[in-house]
Structures are given as C-alpha cells and as structure tokens.
C-alpha cells in the first residue's frame, strides 16, 4: 500500500532533504524513523524509500512538505503519525498520514508549490531569528522600496525561461517554469516574500530574493529584473541569498487525491503571510 505523509521540519540541522553518504539529511532521518516503526522484518521484505514533493536545500525549512512511500504494513492513520514521530528528533514532525492510490506521487502529482521567505532587516541581528530568517543590515532610518520591488515582480509572472536564477548544480531538465503569484509583505523590521509556481529551479527562490533586495535598496531599478530575466545568464543576477529564511509552505494536488492542507498556523509566521 502507498502512504502519504505531511511533515514540517527545521532545516537548520540538516544537509538538505536528499539522502547523502556521511551527511545528516531529512530524508535519512525520516526513512530511519519509518523503518524503526514498521520493524526490521517488514523492511527486509520492502525497504522504506520516500519520494518527496520538494527536495529542500541545506538550511531550508518546510511547513507543508509531502512525501509518499510504499509498504506492506497496515496501520491506522494516526498510528502512523504517533508511531513515526516517536522515532524522530524534535526538528521533524509528521502532521498527518493517509493511504493514497498507486497513482499518487508526492513529486509528480503536485501542480503548485508555494514558498515563503522571511527576512529580518535592521542595524542588528535578532538572536531570536537565528536560522529562522534571513538577515540584511540596514541603517535605522532606512527601509525597502516595496512598490519598486512589487513592480519588478510583474515581469516574472507567467511562463518564462528562468536560467538567470538557476544554480550551476541544478538538475532540472528545463529552465522553463511558471510563476503564478509573487507577494511582498512589509512588517518592519520584517519582510516576507510569498512565491507560488508550478515548480522551481535549484536556488531559484533565493536568487530572486537577492535581486528583489537589490531593487528594494535602490541599487537597481525595477526594470532591472526584466533585463536579468531576458539575459538568461546567471552571472548578471544578484548573488544567492542565504537559506535561513526559506520555507516550503504548501504543495497543491488535484482534489481527487484529497491531500490535507498543511498546518501553517502552527508556525511563527504572521497570519497575514500564511493565512491566504
């Protein structure tokens, strides 16, 4: 049978999602926990291999990650939640579990993904935001030009070649992606970016955030974003911004799979950011 799980995690202790030899990853920890719960004998018959909706990078967090795996073990839905959580560290939690059809794939059945980037900006870092938000030093009297940033985002909506925002390590078969929404929310000294699309390239969100911040500080004009997009050249875009503030917030699937909504309100992010 196929089981889908919804999970949240603090990505700061991990070297990203994907299994790596001699590295602590979310996938490693999750598969060990599931294997411990189902038992050694069941794993010999059918080893636990998880498929995820989004392979987050080192330090990136998740509020609404979705995975699936196949197993011969049958349990009640809440038994999966309680049982697997008992083998997980406090930085990872399963919120829900449910059996799904063999047609469901956590990765390929998804048609929308939404990320949130949280930034703290000001003259001093906040220790309370350590690893939970990005940081940019700004003088006390300075703030971002939100209107210029939002205007620069207009050229990104729709289907485009996002090669200028793609890392050299990206394994995607195509740089063509579709962005449906970009919203920039200012709550000084906090700044939030909500970006929704069908899929994203490696480092794409962090590279976009880096460009937005250049525009917001007046170092580039709002027209610069369109120039970067059209160039299809990573070298002319802003440097990749830090991972700390990036959250995989939500994965959307066709209604036929009845995948539960993520528990966004359990996060520290304000309702204005997550409540839409």
Curated annotation (Swiss-Prot):
The keyword Isomerase applies. The active site is at 57 (nucleophile). It is an enzyme of class 5 (isomerase). One of its GO terms (biological process) is tRNA pseudouridine synthesis. Its EC number is 5.4.99.12. Pfam families: PseudoU_synth_1. Signal peptide: none annotated. Keywords: Isomerase, tRNA processing. One of its GO terms (molecular function) is tRNA pseudouridine(38-40) synthase activity. Substrate binds at residue 115. It catalyses: uridine(38/39/40) in tRNA = pseudouridine(38/39/40) in tRNA. Belongs to the tRNA pseudouridine synthase TruA family. PANTHER family: PSEUDOURIDYLATE SYNTHASE, TRNA PSEUDOURIDINE SYNTHASE-LIKE 1. NCBIfam families: hisT_truA. Homodimer. This is tRNA pseudouridine synthase A. It comes from Polynucleobacter necessarius subsp. necessarius (strain STIR1). The gene is truA.
């Amino acid at each position: 049978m196929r089981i889908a799980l919804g999970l949240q995690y603090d990505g700061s202790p991990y070297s990203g999602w994907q299994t790596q030899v001699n590295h602590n990853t979310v996938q490693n920890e999750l598969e060990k926990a599931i294997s411990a719960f189902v038992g050694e004998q069941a794993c010999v018959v059918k080893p636990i291999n998880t498929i995820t909706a989004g392979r987050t990078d080192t330090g990136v967090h998740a509020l609404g990650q979705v995975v699936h795996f196949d197993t011969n073990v049958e349990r009640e839905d809440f038994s999966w939640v309680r049982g697997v959580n008992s083998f997980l560290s406090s930085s990872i939690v399963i919120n829900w579990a449910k059996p799904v059809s063999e047609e469901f794939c956590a990765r390929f059945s998804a048609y929308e993904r939404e990320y949130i980037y949280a930034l703290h900006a000001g003259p001093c870092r906040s220790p309370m935001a350590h690893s939970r938000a990005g940081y940019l030093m700004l003088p006390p009297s300075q703030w971002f030009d939100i209107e210029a940033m939002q205007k620069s985002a207009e050229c990104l909506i729709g289907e485009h070649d996002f090669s200028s925002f793609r890392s050299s390590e990206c394994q995607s078969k195509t740089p063509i992606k579709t962005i449906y929404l970009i919203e920039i929310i200012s709550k000084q000294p906090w700044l939030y970016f909500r970006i929704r699309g069908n899929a994203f390239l490696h480092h794409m969100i962090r590279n976009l955030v880096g460009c937005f911040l250049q525009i917001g500080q007046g170092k580039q004009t709002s027209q610069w974003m369109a120039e970067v997009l059209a160039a299809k050249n990573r070298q002319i875009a802003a440097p990749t911004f830090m991972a700390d503030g990036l959250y995989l917030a939500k994965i959307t699937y066709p209604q036929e799979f009845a995948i539960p909504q993520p528990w966004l309100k359990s996060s520290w992010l304000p309702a204005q950011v997550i409540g839409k």
